[in-house]
Amino acid sequence: MSDIETRVKEIVVEQLGVNSEEVANESSFVDDLGADSLDTVELVMALEEAFECEIPDEEAEKISTVQEAINYIKERQG
């Protein structure tokens, strides 16, 4: 597991208040982890802060799973 993957999962656990065992790469923030729209906004903000990047709203709307968040950060950190 990469550092980015580990950190993204830690942020998901912190922001959504779920157990780390529940967080799989294919987990949907809304469908699997019970996030609402405010949760997803706060999650994106936490990712931006942790990885020192900006995620535009139109890009954030496309990030709906843990793996999509990991891929987005990896592409920007490349």
Swiss-Prot record:
Pfam families from the UniProt entry: PP-binding (PF00550)
InterPro entries: ACP, ACP-like_sf, PP-bd_ACP, Ppantetheine_attach_site
Gene Ontology biological process terms from the UniProt entry: lipid A biosynthetic process
Molecular function terms, GO-annotated: acyl binding; acyl carrier activity
GO CC, any one term: membrane
Domain Carrier per the UniProt entry, residue ranges: 2-77
Pathway recorded for this protein: Lipid metabolism; fatty acid biosynthesis
Localisation per UniProt entry: Cytoplasm
Record-listed O-(pantetheine 4'-phosphoryl)serine modification sites: S37
Post-translational modification: 4'-phosphopantetheine is transferred from CoA to a specific serine of apo-ACP by AcpS. This modification is essential for activity because fatty acids are bound in thioester linkage to the sulfhydryl of the prosthetic group.
Keyword line: Cytoplasm, Fatty acid biosynthesis, Fatty acid metabolism, Lipid biosynthesis, Lipid metabolism, Phosphopantetheine, Phosphoprotein
SUPFAM superfamilies tied to this protein: ACP-like
Function: Carrier of the growing fatty acid chain in fatty acid biosynthesis.
Family: Belongs to the acyl carrier protein (ACP) family.
Protein name stated in the entry: Acyl carrier protein
